[in-house]
């Protein structure tokens, strides 16, 4: 991979329990516009083993720092991360500020200033969902080998199977849980414990990006509620915030063209960033420049 002279390199960071395939469609859109794209499987995901280092957000940020240093040592960058990937980018900004001057734009999808929680709200449905998540996390933490044995016995078409799906389509957005199918239960448990214990850094470190930072979230996200993204935006006076109605945590999967357009816009030559025009995917919403 050789970045084009003078052009921005887009670096895409996926979330927990998925793989770099999350960005497959985005990559096609962005490279079609002449942009160089770097996407990779994070530690303990897809084709990247867990390794010997403890699985922490800090370690994942250090991994990304090494990737930037070795693969994209010079030239402008646009960084985009979803969910866990957004946390990794926040950690990168705090731990490795030397990259800041090169960052032409940053897109954080389903970002939060809070630690991880199984509780997405206070409604009866949210409480029931939280109970199920807690039971799943407890089982994975204390009996990972037993869970792996069970997953090996599941039909290959089951979303939690530990075998790769044979009839995976070559085009289109990948299902959300394809990453889980390639991730052992012990790694899933370690990742959850890492997220549960994580204490977010002072969010004001992101102020250095000014209006080059864009936060996006789905109004119906049950994993990282949009309220968490709004809380983060409230700490960043210059940030741009978009909350999309009728959209879940799968925002980048369901609307790859929209996300690609936002990234490409930031990858253009630096300058003032006016509000985005209304997107046709959301004809009944307010103009998508609902910036904080």
Regions found by a protein language model. Give the residues of each.
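Conserved HGGG/HGGXW glycine-rich cap/lid loop of the alpha/beta-hydrolase fold
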Residues: 2-49
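Conserved alpha/beta-hydrolase "acid-adjacent" motif
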Residues: 222-228
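Catalytic active-site module of serine/aspartate enzymes centered on a nucleophile-bearing elbow/loop
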Residues: 237-292
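Active-site loop/oxyanion-hole signature of alpha/beta-hydrolase fold enzymes
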Residues: 36, 42-87, 91-101, 113, ...
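The conserved beta1-alpha1 loop
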Residues: 13-15, 82, 217-218
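Short beta-strand/loop motif that positions the catalytic acidic residue
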Residues: 209, 215-217, 221
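Flexible "cap/lid" loop of the alpha/beta hydrolase fold
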Residues: 98-146
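Conserved alpha/beta-hydrolase catalytic His-Asp/Glu region
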Residues: 143-207
């Amino acid at each position: 991979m050789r970045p084009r002279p003078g052009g921005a390199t887009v670096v895409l960071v996926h979330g927990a329990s998925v793989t770099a395939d999350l960005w497959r469609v985005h990559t096609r859109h962005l490279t079609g516009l002449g942009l160089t794209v770097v996407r990779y499987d994070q530690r303990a995901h897809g084709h990247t083993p867990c390794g010997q280092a403890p699985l922490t957000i800090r370690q994942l940020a250090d991994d990304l720092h090494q990737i930037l240093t070795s693969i994209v040592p010079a030239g402008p960058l646009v960084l985009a991360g979803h969910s866990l990937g957004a946390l990794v980018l926040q950690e990168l900004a705090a731990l490795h500020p030397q990259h800041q001057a090169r960052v032409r734009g940053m897109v954080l999808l389903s970002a939060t200033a809070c630690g991880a929680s199984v509780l997405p709200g206070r409604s009866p449905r949210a409480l029931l969902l939280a109970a199920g998540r807690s039971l799943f996390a407890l089982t994975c933490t204390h009996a990972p080998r037993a869970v792996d044995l069970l997953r090996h016995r599941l039909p290959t078409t089951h979303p939690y199977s530990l075998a790769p799906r044979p009839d995976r389509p070559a085009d289109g957005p990948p299902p959300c849980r394809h990453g889980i199918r390639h991730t052992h239960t012990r790694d899933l448990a370690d990742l959850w414990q890492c997220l549960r214990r994580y204490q977010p850094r002072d969010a004001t470190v992101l102020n250095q990006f000014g209006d080059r930072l864009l936060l996006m979230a789905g109004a119906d996200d049950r994993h990282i509620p949009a309220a968490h993204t709004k809380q983060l935006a409230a700490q960043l006076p210059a940030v741009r915030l978009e909350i999309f109605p009728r959209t879940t945590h799968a925002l980048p999967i369901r609307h790859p063209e929209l996300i690609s357009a936002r990234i490409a816009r930031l990858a253009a030559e630096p300058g003032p960033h006016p509000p985005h025009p209304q997107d046709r995917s959301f004809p009944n919403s307010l103009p998508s420049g609902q910036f904080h």
